[in-house]
């Protein structure tokens, strides 16, 4: 088992690797794990870390406490108008990078 101290340090997710499974836990319970830019950036980094780790055969994504993920964190958009949010295209780069992961990814969803 790899201990958390041996893995990259993250602010909004927790990563554990045990028995060839990388478990990524979304860890913003105060916001019901809403997807902020920071969380998505860290999620992509952790997924790519799992992809590049020969000991990892599968990646599981789950949420902390009572929610898997409440959706996009609209607080990061509150000071922008529709055009700014639409043209900024906040999540396309992360979604594209996630789509390139070739190891199986399982969403362990419970709650909201």
Predicted regions mapped to residue ranges:
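Residue-level recognition of alpha-helix initiation/capping sites
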Residues: 41, 89-90, 112
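Histidine-centered beta-alpha loop that forms part of the nucleotide-sugar donor binding/catalytic region
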Residues: 27, 72, 110
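Short glycine/serine/threonine-biased micro-segments
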Residues: 32, 61, 65, 69-70, ...
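Glycine-rich beta-to-alpha active-site loop
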Residues: 97-112
């Amino acid at each position: 088992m790899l201990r958390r101290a041996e893995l990259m340090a993250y602010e909004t997710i927790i990563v554990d690797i045990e028995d060839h499974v990388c478990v990524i836990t979304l860890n913003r319970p105060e916001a019901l794990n809403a997807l902020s830019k920071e969380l998505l950036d860290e999620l992509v980094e952790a997924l790519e870390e799992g992809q590049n780790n020969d000991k990892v055969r599968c990646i599981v994504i789950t949420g902390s406490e009572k929610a898997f993920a409440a959706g996009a964190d609209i607080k990061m958009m509150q000071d922008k108008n529709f055009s700014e949010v639409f043209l900024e295209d906040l999540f396309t780069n992360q979604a594209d990078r996630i789509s390139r992961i070739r190891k199986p990814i399982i969403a362990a969803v419970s709650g909201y």
